[in-house]
Amino acid sequence: MCVLSDLLQYYAKTDPKKFIRYAHPISIVFLFAATVFFFTWEVFFLLPDLIGTEGWFYKANWIVDLVIAYNVWANMLACYRTDCSVARLPKDRLVPGPDEKHLWHHCEDCKQLVPPRSWHCKFCRCCILKRDHHCIFTANCIGHNNHRYFFWFTFYVTLGTAVALVTNFAYMVKYNILLHGPAFIFNIFIWISGSNSPMVKYNLKENVVFSFNLFSVALAGIMLVNQTCIIYRNASFYKREGRYDLGLRKNINIIMGKAGLWTFLSPSIKSPLPHDGAQWQLRKIIK
């Protein structure tokens, strides 16, 4: 993962325009394909075999999977459509007051003073309010105004892949694929060698899906843990200092807005943020 991350950062720095031209659509198509695949695999293949299609439990799983898929895509779309740039501030807020001018810094690219915690993004080509990072899956920067959507995006991606993993595991245990089926690497070797054994192909399919599912839930889980730590300290991806940490309740309110954790229900829930992202209260340090 570190090698992949370094490789992506290298190409991003080399040619930002070309990078986002390909990285954004590829990432979004991949996410869409993965969501549709896991939903279809679980609802139309695994669950009918495990619990049938007549009972209430199957219908409940349908609803849960639909809610998860909706929140993945709705939060992703909200991230994409929300403007976090400094330029969105009212004109009177683009100029710092006398008592806060020392907290602002000059952006060489934008040629202007920008608020604290605002940083320039070479992909968006503007300064972002409380910039966290640029996300290729949402094709936008994650900042003050859309951080809430990004957190729930990572939450529901993790939840969805975790539910799929549990269902996959139950299916494989039912048919003893984990216990008696050939090992994953051995399956690939046999498949490449051209074996026509139906059991080998059957186990290969299940093992490939399970391995991809395991990788997906691990990657999404790492993202979720990282974002949880950021919210806990009111920090950002590149700035982990605790100078803006005002306590868990206030930190949640700053990122999630007035509705707080109820925003997990849907990105359409109105939840005004406590401020516009230009002024940040520092933590009081008692000596």
Each model region followed by its residue ranges:
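Membrane-associated feature with strongest affinity for ZDHHC
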Residues: 1-287
